[in-house]
């Protein structure tokens, strides 16, 4: 006899309700709503208890969805299986029963976790489990959930049960939304780069611009090594650590950061990389290349040459007024005509690299794959044998995210900082992320139940756009998207928020003054 699959649906009754309305303090919930909406459930889910709750909720919903899909049109009668009235072969029935039993066992395992996730506990509390849980599993719920997420991601579940995601419909709405998302992503990347430039200048770090090319005879080695770029930047970080007389296995996050953007040449479509190195201390052996020379026309750092094993690199010191090189006594270089190098602001190199971020989106790079067809015709055969790779913008962890402390700001001020527009500060997206992180820490003592009760109703933006297009028309769709996310200006925010922007030195007016600082030197 096949198992009673219908009985599965009774298990759902053990799932803890998300709406214990009888116990809610509705005034408290209403007071929480603005902060939770501004912070966002995805950010709050980084807290252990809420994160595991959401993880199990999503896992259960997917497994139930797959089970419901598999059971469509399936009936059992005296041991025989019928699919939409047609009797299935015995081997088909046996396989169906075996797979479905495994699916139900996986669901039962997830349901067993749920009672251990006390939604009346705070969202920052790491769940452990009761005595019975320990006897059965010999590990905490935290350890179990982390292992489950690592070893059994939702993608693997879809693949095993042959239940792929439905492909979205490509229409004008989806294209506009995709373009808007990519534009926002590129804008955020550029903000991080420019903020890192600003911070490096303020902290007196050395900034080096580098171009990394790929030699013909090193292409295969580069494509065969998935960690080629990671290893290169790690080696540079270790050189900085060595210069500071620290251990090679120390973290170099506090003394070295990098930003790297790939580009395919417009002439031949050849892949190369533009990198910016930020170093608190120059690697050992770094000396002024113009020292003792009558013509000061050299800018490359000898200490960083020959560190890129896959081709040619050209590490150049970024020079501007009061830069770290000038403070270390380096001479100001001249151009090919012997004239002092043209004065530019310390942000100029940021704008230079930013143009490549704007030039190439992730989708552009994905479409290119190995590079344009014109990339050195003599290498076509070799390239065709290499695996296609997607090269994305790479940067250090938390690169360009540093901001003036927000610990003393009110919750109202933090909410406003998540809604600032670009006109208020060119670093509005970085401020938003920092404010959300601070809010998550403060909301850590709120219970899971309260967060679930206060979370806003989510709207499927794409469906909403498709429904609205009949009223507004395709021509007005772009402006309609912009109007849906209204941003605050300086005139809309409190004095506390304005004071924070002034103290951090990131108002548009303040940065406009700083951008006029020009290069100089000896």
UniProtKB/Swiss-Prot annotation:
Annotated keywords: DNA replication, DNA-binding, Endonuclease, Hydrolase, Metal-binding, Nuclease, Viral DNA replication, Zinc, Zinc-finger
Active site annotation, chain numbering: 352 (o-(5'-phospho-dna)-tyrosine intermediate), 356 (o-(5'-phospho-dna)-tyrosine intermediate)
InterPro entries named in the record: Replication_gene_A-like
Keyword Metal-binding recorded: yes
GO biological process, alphabetically ordered: DNA replication; viral DNA genome replication
Zn finger spans (unnamed): 255-277
Highest taxon of source: Viruses
Chain ranges passing through the membrane: none
Molecular functions (GO terms): DNA binding; endonuclease activity; zinc ion binding
Job description of the protein: The A protein is a specific endonuclease that cleaves the viral strand of supertwisted, closed circular DNA at a unique site in the A gene. The A protein also causes relaxation of supertwisted DNA and forms a complex with viral DNA that has a discontinuity in gene A of the viral strand. The A* protein binds to double-stranded DNA and prevents their hydrolysis by nucleases.
Protein's recorded name: A' protein
Gene: A
């Amino acid at each position: 006899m096949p198992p009673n699959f219908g009985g599965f649906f009774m298990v759902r009754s053990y799932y803890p309700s998300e709406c214990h309305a009888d116990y809610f303090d509705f005034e408290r919930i209403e007071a929480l709503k603005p902060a939770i909406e501004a912070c966002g459930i995805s950010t709050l889910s980084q807290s252990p208890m809420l994160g595991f709750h959401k993880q199990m909720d999503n896992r259960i919903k997917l497994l139930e969805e797959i089970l419901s899909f598999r059971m469509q049109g399936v009936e059992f009668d005296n041991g025989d299986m019928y699919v939409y009235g047609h009797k299935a072969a015995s081997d088909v029935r046996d396989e169906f029963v075996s797979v479905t039993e495994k699916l139900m066992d996986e669901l039962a395992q997830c349901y067993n976790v749920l009672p251990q996730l006390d939604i009346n506990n705070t969202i920052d509390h790491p769940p452990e489990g009761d005595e019975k849980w320990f006897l059965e599993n010999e590990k905490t719920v935290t350890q179990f959930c982390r292992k489950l997420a690592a070893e059994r991601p939702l993608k693997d579940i879809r693949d095993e049960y042959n239940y792929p995601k439905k492909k979205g419909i490509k229409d004008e709405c989806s294209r506009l939304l995709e373009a808007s998302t990519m534009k926002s992503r590129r804008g955020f990347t550029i903000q991080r780069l420019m903020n890192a430039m600003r911070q490096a200048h303020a902290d007196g770090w050395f900034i080096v611009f580098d171009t990394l090319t790929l030699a013909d005879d090193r292409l295969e080695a580069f494509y065969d090594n998935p960690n080629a770029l990671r290893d290169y930047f790690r080696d540079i970080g270790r050189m900085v650590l060595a210069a500071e007389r620290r251990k090679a296995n120390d973290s170099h996050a506090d003394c070295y950061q990098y930003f790297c953007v790939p580009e395919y040449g417009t002439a031949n479509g050849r892949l190369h990389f533009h990198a910016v190195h930020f170093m608190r201390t120059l690697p050992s052996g770094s000396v002024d290349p113009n020292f003792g020379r009558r013509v000061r026309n050299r800018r490359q750092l000898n200490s960083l040459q020959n560190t890129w094993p896959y081709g040619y690199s050209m590490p150049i010191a970024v020079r501007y007024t009061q830069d770290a090189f000038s403070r270390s006594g380096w001479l100001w270089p001249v151009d090919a005509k012997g004239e002092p190098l043209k004065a530019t602001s310390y942000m100029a190199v940021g704008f230079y690299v930013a143009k490549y971020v704007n030039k190439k989106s992730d989708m552009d790079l994905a479409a290119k794959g190995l590079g344009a067809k014109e990339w050195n015709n003599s290498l076509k055969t070799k390239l065709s044998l290499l695996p296609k790779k997607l090269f994305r913008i790479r940067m250090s962890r938390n690169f360009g995210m540093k901001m003036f402390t927000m610990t003393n700001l009110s919750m109202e001020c933090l909410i406003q900082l998540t809604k600032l527009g670009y006109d208020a500060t060119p670093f509005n997206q970085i401020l938003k992320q920092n404010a959300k992180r601070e809010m998550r820490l403060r909301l850590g003592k709120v219970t899971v139940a309260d967060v679930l009760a206060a979370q806003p109703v989510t709207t499927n933006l794409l469906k909403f756009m498709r429904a609205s297009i009949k009223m507004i028309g395709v021509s007005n769709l772009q402006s309609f998207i912009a109007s849906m996310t209204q941003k605050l200006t300086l005139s809309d925010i409190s004095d506390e928020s304005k004071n924070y922007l002034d103290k951090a030195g990131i108002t548009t007016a303040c940065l406009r003054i700083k951008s006029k600082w020009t290069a100089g030197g000896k």
